[in-house]
């Protein structure tokens, strides 16, 4: 099985340093347009695919937002999720969508799983019911969180709320 091309392969193909390729991948303005085009062409020519997981390990920011909705079968929440996802994309974020189906236990499990996958933040429309498990996971994650439409009563003042 052939190995995936690396940043070093791109640098060699483009005739630049590994640091220059890294700057291009980060979108740095300090790279000349001609060099940027050369690096992008080299990436295409050798089939280089940016490894976002590796970048996440280096930067500690995944660019992923966990959007946890209480009931995606409700057309209101479906529309909200679609619109919010598009707005997040405009800001450079990818969205991971989770439906808690009004189950607080499932909600806390989903949030925990999203934390394990390294989301950079949460937007949650909390499920009704027991809040302790969800709050415990959110508190331990220390991840920016915005509550929408509903708020966790015991989280008042801890996580911003937007209705």
For each predicted feature, which ranges?
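Alpha-helical recognition/docking segments in bacterial nutrient-uptake
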Residues: 1-2, 60-163
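N-terminal helix-turn-helix DNA-binding module of bacterial transcription factors
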Residues: 1-61
């Amino acid at each position: 099985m052939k190995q995936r091309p690396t940043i070093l392969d791109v640098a060699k193909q483009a005739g630049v340093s590994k640091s220059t390729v890294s700057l291009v991948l980060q979108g740095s303005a300090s790279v000349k347009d001609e060099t940027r085009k050369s690096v992008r062409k080299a990436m295409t020519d050798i089939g280089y695919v940016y490894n976002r997981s590796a970048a996440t390990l280096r930067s500690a920011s995944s660019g992923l937002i966990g959007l946890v909705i209480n009931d995606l079968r409700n057309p209101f929440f479906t529309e909200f999720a679609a619109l919010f996802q598009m707005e997040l994309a405009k800001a450079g974020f990818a969205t991971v969508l989770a439906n808690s189906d009004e189950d607080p236990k499932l909600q806390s499990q989903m949030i925990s799983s999203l934390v394990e996958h390294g989301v950079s933040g949460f937007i949650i429309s909390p499920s009704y019911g027991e809040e302790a498990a969800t709050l415990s996971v959110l508190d331990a994650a220390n991840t920016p969180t915005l509550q929408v439409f509903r708020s966790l009563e015991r989280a008042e003042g801890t996580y911003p709320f937007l209705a």
